[in-house]
Amino acid sequence: MGKDVIVACDFASREATLNFLDKFTGRKPFVKIGMELYYAEGPAIVKEIKARGHKIFLDLKLHDIPNTVKKAMSVLSRLDVDITNLHAAGTKNMMRAALEGLTREDGTRPLLIAVTQLTSTDQESMENDLMIHAPIDEVVMHYAACAEEAGLDGIVCSPLEAGKVHEKCGKHFLTITPGVRFADGDVGDQKRVMTPAAAKAIGSDYIVVGRPITAASDPVAAYERCVAEFCD
């Protein structure tokens, strides 16, 4: 059984985001706040959505020198989000520094997740653009092992890799998987995709779903369909 469906609120403004969330009068979705919304509205939007009772995945994908990431994570830890992330390509030293910065004085912290390869990346673009010639699944497994060794809680990966990650790193190591679409839906710019039911079957812990819910004619019904396929 999947742990939860995370709704990617990729809106450009506070007004659009809150208008969308106002539709959900029952179960409050776990919300992903990405770069567009965070850069437009700042920490205030995180605090406001949190105050409404939503869990939050703050998806900023930090990637910089270790000390800079450590200081940034120390600031993010004050926002009381539930999950945040960084790029595994930043090295184990950066990931360890991030954990140190994210951990509060009382020892608590949000879950910290590493991004491996974006679901918009395929083998051809990885080789031609990034000059990484290993098979994409091997790269994901390598990044997963590095993240686990650094002490992180899991990774963001394609649902196609979730089962293999659990085999390598254990069931405790979380997999958060975007690239999820309904069987009758448009895949958009995602190149490695799977349905909610298939992601559940293969062992994804969380799925991140954006446009199939946010752009649906009935977002609440689309969300409930996702929950039914993945969580129930």
Where are these regions (language model features)?
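Structural motif
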Residues: 26, 52, 79, 150, ...
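Hydrophobic faces of well-ordered beta-strands that scaffold small-molecule active sites
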Residues: 3-9, 31-33, 56-60, 84-86, ...
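A C-terminal functional module that forms or caps the active site or interfaces directly
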Residues: 43, 157-207
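Glycine-rich phosphate-binding active-site loops on the catalytic face of alpha/beta enzymes
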Residues: 79-91, 182, 189-222
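Conserved anion-binding
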Residues: 2, 68-72, 77-153, 161, ...
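Short, acidic/polar
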Residues: 12-24, 67-75, 136-146, 191-198
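C-terminal helical cap(s) of enzyme catalytic domains, especially alpha/beta-barrels
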Residues: 95-101, 105, 200, 213-232
